[in-house]
């Protein structure tokens, strides 16, 4: 979020042709401590400059005291965490003067002390803060496989009508120390058949929603990426007007 440089040059050119979606990874919405107000103010300047169609952050934490951990870490889903997350989202939305979208996480462990399941927790956050939802379909699938949850029950518990953006991605596979299959939200593979299937099912409830395909590692040729984009667009076209 620097003031100048090549990133801004290219963003300004992109803004001439496309609406932007700005996606944050460093707000640490779930942290026990206070939000970084300097980070929040820099973000406010960035959003004022580009006026994106949407801004989103993750349901996760990445800070503890003065330490920044370069990862999106899971939360214990209890009343105290719910209150804290809602307070932080209220602070973000009040500072930015806009609605924030909250992305569901991909997780690899659960806390025994949690008193909410994940989709119920997300639903309560959305209800209390008025934030929207960024529904990451790959994260839904990864978490449900890793924790042996039902994808159907998970989706049914979410406020799908509040979905304002959708992410699709591929995952990688590993095994834990007990030999159990473990999915990793690596963004390093094509969108899997199971993700496409869930995406079509979700669109039946949401209608056409702005969709992003994420690919960070093991990048294929451009033709492969464009083919995935065309596939997503075809599903969107089947469910109404292009977003």
Could you describe each region identified by the protein language model?
Residues 26-28, 60-62, 106-107, 139-140, ...:
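Short, solvent-exposed loop/turn segments at secondary-structure junctions
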Residues 18-23, 53-57, 100-103, 133-135, ...:
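Hydrophobic faces of well-ordered beta-strands that scaffold small-molecule active sites
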Residues 93, 98-178:
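Acidic/histidine-rich catalytic cores of soluble enzymes
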Residues 36-132:
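Active-site acidic/histidine proton-transfer and metal-coordination neighborhood
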Residues 1-7, 28-38, 108-116, 141-148, ...:
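Acidic-and-aromatic substrate-binding clefts and catalytic sites of carbohydrate-active enzymes
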Residues 2-4, 34, 72-76, 82, ...:
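Gly/Pro-rich active-site loop or hairpin
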Residues 222-242:
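C-terminal helical cap(s) of enzyme catalytic domains, especially alpha/beta-barrels
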Residues 3-22, 38-53, 92-95, 124-128, ...:
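Acidic (Asp/Glu)-rich catalytic clusters
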């Amino acid at each position: 979020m620097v003031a100048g440089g090549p990133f801004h040059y290219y963003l300004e050119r992109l803004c001439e042709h496309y609406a932007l979606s700005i996606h944050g990874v460093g707000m640490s919405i779930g942290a026990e401590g206070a939000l970084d107000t300097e980070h929040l103010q820099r973000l406010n300047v960035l959003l004022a400059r580009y006026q994106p169609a949407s801004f989103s952050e993750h349901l996760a934490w990445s800070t503890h005291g003065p330490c920044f951990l370069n990862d999106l870490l899971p939360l214990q889903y209890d009343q105290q965490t719910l209150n804290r997350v809602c307070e932080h989202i209220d602070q973000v939305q009040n500072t930015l003067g806009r609605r924030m979208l909250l992305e569901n996480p991909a997780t690899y462990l659960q806390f025994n002390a949690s008193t909410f399941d994940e989709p119920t927790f997300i639903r309560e956050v959305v209800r209390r803060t008025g934030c929207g939802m960024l529904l990451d379909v790959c994260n839904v699938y990864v978490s449900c496989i890793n924790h042996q949850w039902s994808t159907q029950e998970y989706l049914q518990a979410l406020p799908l009508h509040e979905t304002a953006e959708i992410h699709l991605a591929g995952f990688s596979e590993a095994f834990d120390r007990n030999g159990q299959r473990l999915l990793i939200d690596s963004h390093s593979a094509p969108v899997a058949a199971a993700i496409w299937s869930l995406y079509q099912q979700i669109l039946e409830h949401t209608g056409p929603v702005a969709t992003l395909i994420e690919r960070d590692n093991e990048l294929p040729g451009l033709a492969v990426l464009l083919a995935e984009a065309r596939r997503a667009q075809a599903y969107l076209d089947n469910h109404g007007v292009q977003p």
